[in-house]
């Protein structure tokens, strides 16, 4: 659905890539999930667009804390309309 890579999408993805390249190495690998939260955010935004993908990524980041065991948590598939 949102695979057209609009300008807002490109800006957000560029910000995430910047985080992955420059900030994440300084913080170390702390994500409790697979894929990492930043990889999840990139995939969700590419799949669903900035609004819905950003919402999914925000919910995921809020779950990434020491009280959560983490584990495998892929981006949900696009639901096909009937």
UniProtKB/Swiss-Prot annotation:
Xref: InterPro entries: Membr_insert_effic_factor_YidD
GO CC terms of this entry: plasma membrane
Superkingdom of origin organism: Bacteria
Record localization: Cell inner membrane
Membrane-topology annotation of the record: Peripheral membrane protein
Record keywords: Cell inner membrane, Cell membrane, Membrane
Pfam families per the UniProt record, alphabetical: YidD
Predominant location: membrane
Xref: SMART domains: Haemolytic
Entry's family note: Belongs to the UPF0161 family.
Protein purpose: Could be involved in insertion of integral membrane proteins into the membrane.
UniProt name for this protein: Putative membrane protein insertion efficiency factor
